[in-house]
């Protein structure tokens, strides 16, 4: 899994050199932000159920047709609603993984790589997930550096969808 730190080490090693001062300073900065990232990951994990449920409700409110149309990609049935929550939860889980890893590697490797194909195959609208992520961002309850760290990965996911 790639993170800025692992990429810096790999680049230096492939060039047969030590890390530069700039690379060491970047690593130091990452470790300084790590506490806030871990705090955010812990908070998002502990609030995951309520955040996911609220995000799904935000999708249903903005896109009411999702609860009215029949089909496996809609939320007209309890099974459909469970799938929506599962998918929103997957995005949130990827965000927490990125917070722990200190980079977008988990999201790049496990989510974004096949995102367009998944959405096309199952006729899922990216706008549903953008709305869900906006709800999570607005309601996660984080502040300060923890919020900054979490919001950066939420924004990364949103930008991947649009």
From Swiss-Prot:
Q: How does it sit in the membrane?
A: Peripheral membrane protein
Location(s) in or outside the cell: Cellular thylakoid membrane
UniProt: (2R,3E)-phycoerythrobilin binding residues? 84
Q: How is it modified after translation?
A: Contains one covalently linked bilin chromophore.
A GO cellular component term found in this entry reads: plasma membrane-derived thylakoid membrane
Q: What is its main location?
A: membrane
**Which GO biological-process labels does this protein carry?**
photosynthesis
Gene3D superfamilies linked: Phycocyanins
One Pfam entry for this protein is Phycobilisome
Task: Recite the UniProt keywords alphabetically.
Answer: Antenna complex, Bile pigment, Chromophore, Electron transport, Membrane, Photosynthesis, Phycobilisome, Thylakoid, Transport
Stored SUPFAM superfamilies? Globin-like
Residues annotated as coiled-coil are none
Is Electron transport tagged as a keyword?
A: yes
Asked if Transmembrane is a keyword of the record, the answer is: no
Highest rank taxon of the organism:
Bacteria
State the oligomer form and interacting partners. Heterodimer of an alpha and a beta chain.
Record family assignment? Belongs to the phycobiliprotein family.
Query: So what does this one do?
Result: Light-harvesting photosynthetic bile pigment-protein from the phycobiliprotein complex.
Q: Which PANTHER family match?
A: C-PHYCOCYANIN ALPHA SUBUNIT, PHYCOBILISOME 32.1 KDA LINKER POLYPEPTIDE, PHYCOCYANIN-ASSOCIATED, ROD 2-RELATED
Q: What is this protein called?
A: R-phycocyanin-2 subunit alpha
Question: Which gene is annotated as encoding this protein in its UniProt record?
Answer: rpcA
């Amino acid at each position: 899994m790639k993170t800025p730190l692992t990429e810096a080490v790999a680049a230096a090693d492939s060039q047969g050199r030590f890390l530069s001062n700039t690379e060491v300073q970047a690593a130091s900065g990452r470790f300084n932000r790590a506490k806030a990232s871990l705090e955010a990951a812990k908070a998002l994990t502990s609030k995951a159920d309520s955040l996911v449920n609220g995000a799904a409700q935000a999708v249903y409110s903005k896109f009411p047709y999702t609860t009215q149309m029949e089909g496996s990609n809609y939320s007209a049935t309890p099974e459909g609603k469970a799938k929506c929550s599962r998918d929103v939860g997957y995005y949130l889980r990827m965000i927490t993984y990125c917070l722990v890893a200190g980079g977008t590697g988990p999201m790049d490797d496990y989510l974004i790589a096949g995102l367009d194909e998944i959405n096309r195959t199952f006729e899922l609208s990216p706008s549903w997930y953008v709305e869900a992520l906006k709800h999570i961002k607005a309601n996660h309850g984080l502040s300060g550096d923890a919020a900054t760290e979490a919001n950066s990965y939420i924004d990364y996911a949103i930008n991947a969808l649009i």
